[in-house]
Amino acid sequence: MVKAIKVMLIPNNVQKTKMFQYAGASRFAYNWALAREKESYEKGGKFISDSELRKEFTKLRHSDEYAWLLNISNNVTKQAIKDACTAYKNFFKDLQKFPRFKSRKRSMPKFYQDNVKIQFSNTHVKLEGFSSSRKANKQKKNWVRLAEHGRIPTDVKYMNPRISFDGLNW
């Protein structure tokens, strides 16, 4: 059985900044993939698969103009591109309207975390890419505090973990 659990995180200021950077990179990757798909369709081309778009995006990440993307986990941008391709496919299957570009004002800041690399304890969660030190005494600083202790079960498999900002809390 698949069950959704939504919990509130209490990040410090450095972690909040990192989360907003991840959400911005996710929005950028989604918009970039949607623009590439739209451009290809207008030129009469076929649908570009998400694997091809991810390869192009990897080359884009390593260019000097987009060097800021190298500080972001690749799983965040990879899933955003997959989401854009899924939304585009659903439009052509008449399941949804045409996907809209995400804006800073209108869209909810959110991003994906890899379910293999995310770790949970009773009181904290460790997100991918937040570790800044390998020293044992500073490892706990990389963990984000949970508002509700013991809410997340630790002995289950996690599917598609997403982190979103609702305007007040993560």
Task: Walk through the language-model features, giving the residues of each.
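Nucleic-acid substrate recognition interfaces
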Residues: 1-170
